[in-house]
Amino acid sequence: MAQVQQLTPAQQAALRNQQAMAANLQARQIVLQQSYPVIQQVETQTFDPANRSVFDVTPANVGIVKGFLVKVTAAITNNHATEAVALTDFGPANLVQRVIYYDPDNQRHTETSGWHLHFVNTAKQGAPFLSSMVTDSPIKYGDVMNVIDAPATIAAGATGELTMYYWVPLAYSETDLTGAVLANVPQSKQRLKLEFANNNTAFAAVGANPLEAIYQGAGAADCEFEEISYTVYQSYLDQLPVGQNGYILPLIDLSTLYNLENSAQAGLTPNVDFVVQYANLYRYLSTIAVFDNGGSFNAGTDINYLSQRTANFSDTRKLDPKTWAAQTRRRIATDFPKGVYYCDNRDKPIYTLQYGNVGFVVNPKTVNQNARLLMGYEYFTSRTELVNAGTISTT
């Protein structure tokens, strides 16, 4: 009689993990097939940012939340007698300065800037977020609705109207619920914190650092917001399917955090590798580096090369700025603004057990006074691993 081969503890753990993943995928498919997708307005406000610029939005505690669409409109008046102002490279992406989301368990998810949110939205869409495409069709397709809109300049004495949209993701995508939040918890509440630009941050004088500004120019000191309005729409799945033991839920999806986060690094030296370490136990999907060279943002002329490097000093990619941009064009079919470098790892996320096993490397050619590197991360982590995970590197 043949002996039954016993599984080793490692094999048993692998089998349990495989079974859990299969059950999660099956539950996800049932939820997507049987629940109802809803997008619902949960809050709208109009305000003067000179008086208040930070707001806490309370989303609806219903269903499985996939994310939030935030619409922002603003009116800006240039009160200067003669001088105009012009859009900065980041422009209306800076209408929102910071976004933070807390789930019903008070667990923080995304905490990042408006520009980082917009750039990740662009990378995942494969084109500038919510922008129309040029077509030679005789049918009048095109930029009919001005969905994202801002005047290139605001003349002296004139008022400009701006419209901007942000997608704040909780789930990874419409069909991949990794990171989604179960909000059917009446006793608790979610919180979406929005910090908007104000008269001190939105307008940069000539020669000032335009990183957080929307407009820059000689007339900047006399520019002001007339008002800002925002509307938040919650995207969620309602009427969740029910089985014998209650709701059918993709438990692994709901126990995973999908986060966007950013940090700032200083201390760069010309022609010396500057290494930013990836924290352990996160699965990094993308990295965005913005080289703020003391207020100058250049098209790669101040960088020798960029790299992702493992602990044994092997470069998984090491490219000059132009070749790095060529890789980016394969993802979004265009370039990001000057000084912005995008690294895509979503096909094979970076995942390390030890802090410092993988680093993002920038070797600058020139470094101006007050130069810094702004890092934006997109990653997964599980709630169980979060206890032991490292913190995002910053200086």
Curated annotation (Swiss-Prot):
Compartmental location: Virion
Main subcellular localisation: virion
SUPFAM superfamilies reported in the protein's UniProt record: Group II dsDNA viruses VP
GO cellular component terms, A-Z: viral capsid
Keyword line: Capsid protein, Virion
Function, as annotated: Major capsid protein self-assembles to form an icosahedral capsid with a pseudo T=25 symmetry, about 66 nm in diameter, and consisting of 240 capsid proteins trimers. The capsid encapsulates an inner membrane and the genomic dsDNA genome. The major coat protein P3 and two assembly factors (P10 and P17) are needed during the assembly of the virus particle inside the host cell, when the capsid protein multimers are capable of enclosing the host-derived membrane, containing the virus-encoded membrane-associated proteins.
Subunit structure: Homotrimer.
Protein name: Major capsid protein P3
Organism annotation: Enterobacteria phage PRD1
UniProt gene name: III
